[in-house]
């Protein structure tokens, strides 16, 4: 366990626990002006056990060694390759740890069992779900195809936020004021984690770190805000 990150809190069986997760990837390609991420390889996984009020019970920041160390050329394609020196410094000081992808998976699944996790949550969860599956299939030569076991409930805070915030007048005004509208024929408020967190903190200058655990921390606050709204909303990744 990464002692710089974790002071494990006692498990309370009356509490419902969730696993928040975020990934950063290499092998993203720009095709026709759009980022193609279907072959993305995960090099950074941040995850935390949280409750609906944002209390953090355990958290990890992990560099996936097969990609970060074993695919040096590929890492140059990472969307945020300029952060690579930062990763090396944090690995040296212990604020991040190296693991193989299968070690990451075993750790996550053991935490999910230990805390009886209700759901795995990510912002734009389809991307993280897909990237973890793609990477696992690559490093195991398809011996293991799915990162999360069949039946794992996946929630998407982007979908939740769309139902909670997209039509909220104060959110729409905030996005219009600061230029956070989509480029659709009829512009709509953006629902990126960065913009949502700017709204929640009333800080339009906030810049998302785009590193796994740091993004988990802001996405946890988006989850908390959605739950606190007590509004009917879609949660599951595959829910229409």
Model-predicted segments: where are they?
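Conserved non-catalytic scaffold segment of RNase H-like nuclease domains
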Residues: 3, 8-133
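Substrate-recognition/cap helix-loop segment adjacent to the acidic, metal-dependent catalytic center
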Residues: 127-155
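Conserved protein kinase catalytic core
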Residues: 28-30, 162, 221
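Acidic, Mg2+-coordinating catalytic module of metal-dependent nucleases/exonucleases
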Residues: 119-126, 130-131, 176-240
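Short alpha-helix plus adjacent loop in nuclease-associated cores
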Residues: 155-182
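Hydrophobic residues within well-ordered, non-membrane alpha-helices that form the packing/core
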Residues: 112, 132, 136, 161, ...
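Short, polar/flexible loop-turn hinges at active-site or ligand-entry regions and domain interfaces
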Residues: 88-95, 142-148, 203-208
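Structural signal for conserved beta-strand scaffold positions within catalytic alpha/beta enzyme cores
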Residues: 61-64, 153-159
């Amino acid at each position: 366990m990464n002692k710089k990150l974790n002071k494990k809190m006692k498990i309370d069986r009356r509490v419902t626990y969730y696993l928040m997760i975020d990934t950063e990837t290499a092998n993203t390609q720009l095709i026709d002006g759009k980022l193609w991420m279907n072959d993305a390889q995960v090099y950074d996984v941040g995850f935390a056990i949280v409750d609906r009020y944002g209390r953090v019970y355990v958290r990890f920041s992990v560099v996936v060694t097969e990609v970060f160390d074993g695919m040096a050329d590929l890492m140059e394609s990472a969307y945020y390759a300029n952060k690579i020196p930062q990763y090396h410094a944090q690995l040296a000081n212990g604020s991040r740890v190296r693991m193989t992808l299968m070690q990451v998976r075993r750790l996550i699944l053991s935490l999910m069992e230990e805390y009886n996790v209700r759901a795995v949550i990510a912002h734009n969860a389809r991307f993280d779900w897909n990237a973890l599956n793609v990477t696992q299939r690559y490093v195991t030569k398809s011996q293991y195809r799915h990162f999360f076991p069949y039946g794992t409930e996946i929630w998407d805070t982007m979908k939740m936020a769309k139902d909670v915030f997209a039509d909220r007048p104060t959110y729409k005004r905030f996005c219009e004021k600061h230029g956070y509208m989509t480029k659709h024929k009829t512009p709509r408020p953006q629902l990126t984690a960065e913009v949502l967190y700017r709204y929640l903190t009333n800080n339009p200058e906030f810049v998302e770190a785009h590193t796994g655990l740091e993004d988990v921390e802001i996405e946890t606050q988006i989850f908390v805000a959605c739950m606190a709204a007590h509004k009917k909303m879609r949660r599951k990744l595959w829910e229409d």
